[in-house]
Regions:
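Hydrophobic anchor residue at the start of the ABC signature
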Residues: 144
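Walker A (P-loop) phosphate-binding loop of ABC-type ATPase nucleotide-binding domains
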Residues: 35-39
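Helix-to-loop junction immediately C-terminal to a conserved catalytic motif
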Residues: 48
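Conserved ABC transporter NBD signature motif
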Residues: 56-64, 71-72
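Conserved ABC ATPase "signature" region
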Residues: 96, 100-103, 108-126
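A short, flexible loop at the N-terminus of ABC-type nucleotide-binding domains that lies
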Residues: 1-4, 8-20, 26, 69
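Conserved catalytic motifs of ABC-family nucleotide-binding domains
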Residues: 151
Length: 155
């Protein structure tokens, strides 16, 4: 269970992006929708431990994610609206690199994970192609594969 308690984030220019957000999210797959400027990206970056909220607490299965960021990074699949990738790297190589970062140490397990995900998102035939050459839809599918690495508890 992901629990946010009174999470607030105020940027240096005094813009209040989050104001006392309190919610519980069970394991599963979720999307976050809202108008421009509603704080969606700020909330997701805080959950993913990419930035620290100004105040409040975020826990995942009772673990303080700000104190132990690796605990959630290993169990979270995150697909931001704009995900930066190295455009000249192939889809296969990038997913393999991401698998290493997610803690998949064994080369056989990494190979199986990457090949399975590329097949699931229908990118197997272009696995050796640089991501820069992908269409917008192909990049989105690549991002989905990236978010699914390591069979995360929360996506």
């Amino acid at each position: 269970m992901l629990t946010l308690t009174d999470v607030t984030h105020v940027y240096p220019n005094n813009t209040r992006a989050l104001d006392g957000v309190t919610l519980e999210i069970p394991r599963g797959m979720y999307g976050l929708l809202g108008p421009n400027g509603a704080g969606k990206s700020t909330l997701m970056r805080s959950i993913a431990t990419l930035q620290t909220p100004s105040s409040g607490a975020i826990t995942f299965d009772g673990i303080d994610v700000m104190a132990e960021p690796e605990a959630i990074r290993a169990r979270l699949g995150y697909l931001p609206q704009d995900f930066g990738v190295y455009p000249r790297v192939t889809a296969y190589d990038m997913l393999e690199h991401m698998a290493v970062l997610k803690g998949i140490a064994g080369s056989a397990e990494r190979k199986e994970t990457v090949e399975t995900l590329l097949n699931q998102v229908n990118l197997w035939k272009v696995r050796k192609k640089a991501i820069a050459g992908f269409s917008g839809g192909m990049r989105q599918r690549f991002g989905i594969a990236q978010a699914l690495i390591g069979n995360p508890d929360l996506i």
